[in-house]
Amino acid sequence: MAGAEPDHESRLLPLVGNVYVPRDELFGHLKQSDFLGYTLKALVDGIVPAIRTYVDLSPGEFDSFADILKLYEGGIKLPNIPALEEVRKRFPLQLVKDLIPMGGDFLLKLPKPQIIKADEKAWMTDEEFAREMLAGVNPMMIKRLTEFPPKSTLDPSKYGDHTSTITEAHIGRSLEGLTVEQALADNRLYIVDQHDNLMPFLVDINNLDGSFVYATRTLLFLQGNGTLAPVAIELSSPLIQGDLTTAKSTVYTPQHAGVEGWIWQLAKAYASVNDYGWHQLISHWLNTHAVMEPFVIATNRQLSVTHPVYKLLHPHYRDTMNINARARGLLINAGGVIEMTVFPRKHAMPMSSMVYKNWNFTEQALPDDLIKRGMAVEDPSSPHKVRLLIEDYPYAADGLAVWHAIEQWVTDYLTIYYPNDGVLQGDVELQAWWKEVREVGHGDLKDAAWWPKMHTVAELIKACATIIWTGSALHAAVNFGQYPYSGYHPNKPSASRRPMPSPGSEEYALLERAPEKAFILTITNQFQALVGISLMEILSKHSSDEVYLGQHDTPAWTSDAKAQEAFRRFGARLEGIEKQVVAMNGDPRLKNRTGPAKFPYMLLYPNTSDHTGQAEGLTARGIPNSISI
């Protein structure tokens, strides 16, 4: 599409809006991704205003968990406002028929998320709450606890002492007879620590209308049966003392009856709010979508399409720039859906930008990440050269198998073209590619000591394996479980609105009288929930023509028989992993594979063997080659 100057491109509207995408990065294949763009636009332009009108005309709150379940059983009717009519006129006929039926009110009816399909109350159990830290949608936050009480890394000159207030008295009775020192020594204590991540932003976040968020620490104990149990949750809010932002902290421990049982449910909910926000902004958007862009750009700018590294990486870039452009125009833009629904709101992008300053490419490799978090140790005798300290850690167990398969494929492929380090060092295109990745794509981090020098074949193998892992398996792990786990928002609320009820308060009295209502009034409001859930349903679906890891959409991608054979072996390894995943999910000893919700962990099931679209839709299984949604 040329403008006044034939040598220049103009932007394609309406889908990518004002975010420029190079011509060869636009969706060139007429596939479900095209409908995705229209669907997101329809959500923002039509359905969101209709939801807002519905909430304004109704009481504006869910009354109970049963009231929320009506979303999946009969749906709710949204008013037929002019914005919906405008969407009907502007968008493709088939999409309009499927998404916004002609005439009358628009029925917002959602499929029942997997987390409540088998048991509508399983999400409330401590076991499921903890299991999702190992097999949920954000299973890369948990760390092994190495000191007690947990310490803070916040600058004491600005924040004072933020050492945790959790004591042995809080957790001692929950350690199966061990002392804290013994539990630490035996690798039995773990933590999901959001305190330092969020505390610097909480003053601003809690100054927003209708927002009250805590910085949380969740302490977990590895039980003898291999499952985790939450033993304490610390809720901290900022306390300004002179020039210092100190913390006011309260520790909650498990209770399962009466009003104290509901206080514990709320403590878990506040921790889940932290997890939801971090997942959306950091684990998902930043650490998969955003970080791929410098590699996509440098590869297209510096490597010819016939270069072996281009051929290796290109399938893992498919549609990424385009979907990111749509996200910037519709989702993460100022006032967009993410700011509407996720607790940092207008502070979301500043927060993710701040986190990016500490990003380290070498730590994105799964084994390195697990070792850094203390979840694994190096072990040359183990199949993947690292040994998990929690054996039944589904994300890590499946992830290591997939990582190893990727690494082996990359090794087999690259050693065809780089038999020694000298050949690599003499490859001018490759060296220019890596120079741009480091010095242009990451100009602010170019002097970091951790960057590979790209002097050895081993460095290239690790770098390419990390890029492929990020664009395929890591994104699959954090994306396709969004609706299955968070589509029922009491399980994964995106925001909290008021502090923990204190005895004698009106809120505490409501918690005693109508606990579900009090819980609902504390978490994500109705408007945020309806918009957020509608978005997650769109983003969690596999398309009908998905290309999965170990598959290729261009059979003639290379004429090199050795490369073709190496790729065939890669596919065979992935199909072997599929069988392993199914077998582990059926092993009753591995309790974290399915949990109380009876929802088997399949997010890292490769789905390489599927050539007929069996994983289409909200199946929560399959690893696409690239970030295309």
Predicted regions and their residues:
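Long, compositionally biased charged/polar stretches
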Residues: M1-I629
